[in-house]
Amino acid sequence: MLIKTGDKVRVISGKDRGQEGTVKKVISAKNRIVVEGVNKIKKHQKPTNVNPQGGIVDIEAPIDASNVMYLDPSTNEPTRLGVRREDGKRVRYAKKSGKDLEN
């Protein structure tokens, strides 16, 4: 999976289509990602030492990685990602602009 934690992405399909956010977590075994502020669900939590109140909380649920596209930092437009080798290292790049991305 070419999307990494901290990348800016835009949701391209589903109930949250059009929303943008930062990737908080990548679950590569299931090809899913957690995006900040996207796919919010309500979860009932029991009281714990950390949260003595308990109750209903809003959390971000994972969405499939195919439902998001990386946002090119130079143009702020969705783009596909590619990988090429430079000096024996893998370098990610935006396919629309051709610019390298810091890993």
UniProtKB/Swiss-Prot annotation:
GO cellular component, one term: ribosome
UniProt key word Ribosomal protein: yes
GO MF annotation list: rRNA binding; structural constituent of ribosome
CDD domains attached to this UniProt entry: KOW_RPL26
SMART domains: KOW
Family: Belongs to the universal ribosomal protein uL24 family.
Complexes and interactors: Part of the 50S ribosomal subunit.
Job description of the protein: One of two assembly initiator proteins, it binds directly to the 5'-end of the 23S rRNA, where it nucleates assembly of the 50S subunit.
NCBIfam families found in the cross-reference section: rplX_bact
Protein name, per record: Large ribosomal subunit protein uL24
Species of provenance: Lactiplantibacillus plantarum (strain ATCC BAA-793 / NCIMB 8826 / WCFS1)
